[in-house]
Curated annotation (Swiss-Prot):
It is a multi-pass membrane protein. Keywords: Cell inner membrane, Cell membrane, Ion transport, Membrane, Potassium, Potassium transport, Transmembrane, Transmembrane helix, Transport. It comes from the Bacteria. The keyword Ion transport applies. Residues 217-244 are annotated as: Disordered. Its main location: membrane. Belongs to the KdpA family. GO terms for molecular function: P-type potassium transmembrane transporter activity; potassium ion binding. The chain crosses the membrane at residues 3-23, 63-83, 134-154, 177-197, 284-304, 312-332, 359-379, 388-408, 411-431, 450-470, 515-535, 558-578. One of its GO terms (cellular component) is plasma membrane. This is Potassium-transporting ATPase potassium-binding subunit.
């Protein structure tokens, strides 16, 4: 535990050192002086001319929301088309065929919504062109969308008596050009230095040092599996010394995968694969990359509203929630897995099932907490192999709404929605009209807040109920009982909150889950974005109220406690009954 606390302290210290200047820089990027890099400003102006965009023309919230939805619909159509046309497109050295319609739909929605849920195995499904032009591009654009939306909300708080909240195309372009691209280049070069691969070679077949013996299913002349009288597959022993090593442009996709809190990797093993995450140092940088922009945006928020203490208060709330749950996760994983203990397995170092030996329990547990606190979903250990309580932590973090740092942009605007709820509750307690940052919280804002908070629980709980009742949903559950229910609950929690990680024991690459989770991902993204932009518009139009003796300070310890309490209260009331049927019941049964 001491090693974990030391690594956690170092991680948070380095994160703070990097996030503060980045946050200040982003405040300039989305202000009047985007950058001193004149060549980037020239590129920016060129992009506006090519696209026919007037960067000086600002938008109301409805126009802004339509632009957000339009660009994401076009992105989803492009990714879908790339997958379906894959056999006839270049950069496909393995000759992969077209992806099925339901899987193409799921993947297109997944990457456009910043979820990166993957029901397929990347190294055996997607060509290099599909990975680069489709998935990696959406890693940039989905992150830029989140940044643009939160910047619009911040402008709503910062402006008064205004009808506009900015220009989406400008925010979208600047987020990509000035923030995501430069950081991705730096991180990608670092990953290459650590051993992550970056090439366009065909897959390599190599001879292993030792032969591998495995059970190979027997088939008849038509290729159908042969089964015995009990219906079990008939197998025969086979031995091989050949292994296929996947190749590809990995480091470049890995960088934006982490920085954009996307999470979807080129390989099925994700960041547990040595070609994606080769060393403990690379692993540390991956964890830093996940939280870097979400943490920096808190400083951007403080700078743009003219009170840096506001950003510190939000960051403190996020950090306290994160540290408490990270320590609990580590405690759970340092304990032996009861199922393995019954088999006499040595677990002196904790639960190592599903973890890479080069990372161990400490780095794996920290990664688990970070990737689910943010809406990243990348994994360096298998979440389905966590202990019952170890699996409870990432699921609960996701169900809190991805507001503990959260996704790029989405984490902060989600936490600001809870901040509005917190001041509303405080206003009810003292009998005053609530206000936040000098803006009065009225009926419309509370309606939008309620929608933004209630959408994801509705999608999660209804989706889970439908899945366990429908035959198509039950067919994907291979682990019966409480753990099987946990797998389904985790899948819909991950999809609705745009995380993308999974309890991978669930067989989710089926028409039922591909369509159901695709719908949930889309609604979970845009049914929150639209209410947030609506609030941005109404806040921008309001007059700023003067601070009085009765105004609740939203930059001190009391507000931090109120904000944390609001997040936990909503999460507990909404999900504890479902969690009691899953990971909690599983833990008590052992």
């Amino acid at each position: 535990m001491n090693a974990f606390l030391l690594q956690l302290a170092i991680y948070l210290a380095v994160l703070l050192v990097l996030a503060r200047p980045l946050g200040t820089y982003m405040a300039r990027v989305f202000g009047d002086a985007p950058s001193r890099a004149h060549w980037l400003r020239s590129v920016e102006r060129l992009l506006y001319r090519v696209a026919g965009v007037d960067p000086r023309a600002e938008m109301g919230w409805k126009h802004y929301a339509l632009a957000v939805i339009a660009v994401n619909v076009l992105g989803a159509l492009a990714v879908y088309a790339l997958q379906r046309l894959q056999p006839w497109l270049p950069l496909n050295p393995q000759g992969f065929g077209a992806v099925t319609p339901d899987s193409s739909f799921n993947t297109a929605v997944s990457f456009v919504t910043n979820t990166n849920w993957q029901g397929y195995s990347g190294e055996s499904t997607m060509s290099y062109l599909t990975q680069m032009l489709g998935l990696a591009v959406q890693n940039f654009l989905s992150a830029a969308t989140g940044i643009a939306v939160v910047i619009a909300l911040i402008r709503g708080f910062a402006r008064h008596s205004a009808r506009t909240i900015g220009n989406f195309w400008v925010d979208f372009t600047r987020g990509t050009l000035y923030v995501l691209l430069p950081l991705s280049v730096i991180v990608a070069v670092f990953f290459v230095s650590q051993g992550a691969i970056q090439n366009f070679d065909a897959y390599k077949e190599v001879t292993t040092v030792a032969a591998t013996t495995y059970d190979n299913p027997k088939t008849d002349a038509q290729g159908n599996p042969i089964k015995d009288a009990q219906g079990n597959p008939v197998t025969e022993k086979a031995t091989t010394q050949k292994q296929t090593l996947p190749m590809g442009p990995i480091a470049s996709q890995e960088a934006i995968k982490m920085l954009g809190t996307n999470g979807g990797g080129p390989f099925n093993a994700n960041s547990a694969h040595p070609y994606e995450n080769p060393t403990p140092l690379a692993n540390f940088v991956q964890m830093l990359s996940i939280f870097l922009i979400p943490a920096a945006l808190c400083f951007t928020f403080g700078a743009m509203v003219g009170d840096r203490r506001q950003g510190w208060a939000v960051l403190a709330s996020m950090t306290i929630l994160f540290v408490v749950l990270a320590v609990f996760e580590m405690w759970a994983e340092l304990h032996a897995n009861p199922m393995l203990a019954h088999l006499g397995v040595d677990q002196a170092v904790g639960n190592m099932e599903g973890k890479e030996t080069r990372f161990g329990v400490v780095a794996s547990s920290l990664f688990v907490t970070i990737t689910t606190a943010a809406s990243c979903g990348a994994v360096n250990a298998m979440h389905d192999s966590l202990t019952a309580l170890g699996g409870f932590v990432p699921m609960f973090l996701i169900q809190l709404g991805e507001v503990v740092f959260g996704g790029v942009g989405s984490g902060l605007y989600g936490m600001l929605v809870y901040a509005i709820l917190a001041v509303f509750i405080a206003g009810l307690m003292i009998g005053r009209t609530p206000e936040y940052l000098g803006k009065k919280i009225e009926v419309f804002e509370m309606k939008m807040t309620s929608i933004a908070i209630l959408v994801t629980p509705l999608l999660v709980l209804v989706g889970t109920a439908v899945a366990v009742l429908a035959s198509g949903g039950r067919a994907g559950i291979f682990n019966p009982g409480t753990h099987g229910f946990s797998e389904v609950l985790y899948a819909f929690s991950s999809a609705a909150n745009n995380n993308g990680s999974a309890f991978a024991g669930l067989s989710a690459n089926t028409p039922f889950y591909n369509v159901a989770l695709g719908i949930v991902m889309w609604l979970g993204r845009f049914w929150i974005i639209v209410p947030v932009l609506a609030m941005a518009g109404t806040f921008a139009a309001k007059k700023r109220l003067p601070v009085t003796v009765g105004t609740l300070p939203t930059h001190g310890p009391l507000f931090v406690v109120l904000l944390i309490g609001s997040v936990l209260l909503v999460g507990a009331l909404t999900y504890i009954p479902a969690l009691a049927l899953g990971p909690i019941a599983e833990h008590l049964a052992r």
